[in-house]
């Protein structure tokens, strides 16, 4: 049986901000059509890792990286069309990032920039993305309203809809639910479970219960290192990751005190 090529493959990845190394030689694979969880405390390198995957780190002054990142077996950093590649990898930040545009134009912005001009196509795509972000019913009668007029939680869902408008192959979510109420979070989690049928999802979260609900596999990072990786199907495995995390943090604090 031929082994399937991973959707994302990371090999001996290292990253720096200036002289400070923030990711220390980590390697892992992410399969197609899976939700892959990344957990860890603040400053563990999770967000920097996402930036290396969607090639935004190289636009950060003073940053550099070494190692391999592949998508479908091809070297991501060998792709000359950076913006074409980034279209394939959607990114949702922890807090909403709104464009000073209407709700409709926030979602239609990327498709238009990639050449979609047919209004019926745009209308259908805007509705689909807003539905996927659990926002359509709340805004369908005011699509001409500025997105910045929405509540914080609604703006975050608009950010998710905008990321989906790229029709990405990989969707990176960096603690997407931090600004969203629990009910809406559960709605979007249901959507993510459906989306994994058509894309790969990388979920950075500090909520272990969320990783347990969504991720097939989860890896734990600490101080830029990959500490543990494993299946998250069973509660005991997650609890073991937590136990090890608490032990590691305790010893780290003792060493630094």
Where on the chain are the PLM-derived regions?
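Short helical segment in ABC ATPase nucleotide-binding domains corresponding to the A-loop/adjacent helical element
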Residues: 54, 104-113, 123, 127
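ABC ATPase NBD Q-loop/coupling interface
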Residues: 68-84, 144
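Conserved ABC ATPase "signature" region
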Residues: 74, 120-141, 254
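Conserved signature/switch motifs of ABC ATPase nucleotide-binding domains
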Residues: 166, 197
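Catalytic Walker B motif of ABC-type/P-loop ATPase nucleotide-binding domains
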Residues: 171-174
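Conserved H-loop
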Residues: 199-204
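Conserved beta-strand-loop-alpha-helix hinge in the C-terminal portion
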Residues: 225-252
């Amino acid at each position: 049986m031929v082994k399937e090529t991973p959707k994302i493959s990371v090999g001996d990845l290292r990253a720096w901000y200036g002289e400070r190394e923030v990711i220390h030689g980590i390697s892992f694979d992410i399969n197609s059509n899976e939700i892959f969880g990344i957990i860890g405390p603040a400053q563990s390198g999770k967000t920097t890792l996402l930036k290396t995957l969607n090639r935004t780190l190289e636009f950060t002054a003073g940053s550099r990286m070494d190692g391999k990142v592949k998508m479908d077996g091809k070297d991501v950093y060998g792709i000359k069309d950076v913006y074409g590649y980034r279209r394939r990898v959607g990114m949702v930040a922890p807090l909403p990032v709104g464009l000073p545009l209407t709700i409709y134009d926030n979602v239609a912005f990327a498709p238009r920039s990639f050449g979609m001009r047919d209004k019926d196509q745009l209308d259908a795509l805007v509705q689909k993305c807003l539905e996927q972000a659990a926002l359509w019913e709340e805004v369908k009668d005011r699509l001409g309203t500025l997105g910045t007029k929405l509540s914080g939680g609604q703006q975050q869902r608009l950010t998710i809809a905008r990321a989906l408008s790229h029709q990405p192959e990989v969707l990176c979510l960096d603690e997407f639910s931090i600004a969203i109420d629990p009910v809406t979070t559960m709605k979007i989690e249901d959507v993510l479970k459906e989306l994994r049928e058509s894309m790969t999802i990388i979920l950075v979260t500090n909520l272990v219960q969320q990783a347990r609900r969504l991720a097939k596999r989860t890896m734990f990072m600490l101080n830029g290192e990959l500490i543990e990786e494993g299946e998250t199907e069973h509660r005991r495995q997650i609890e073991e990751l937590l136990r090890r995390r608490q032990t590691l943090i305790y010893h780290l604090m003792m060493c630094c005190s």
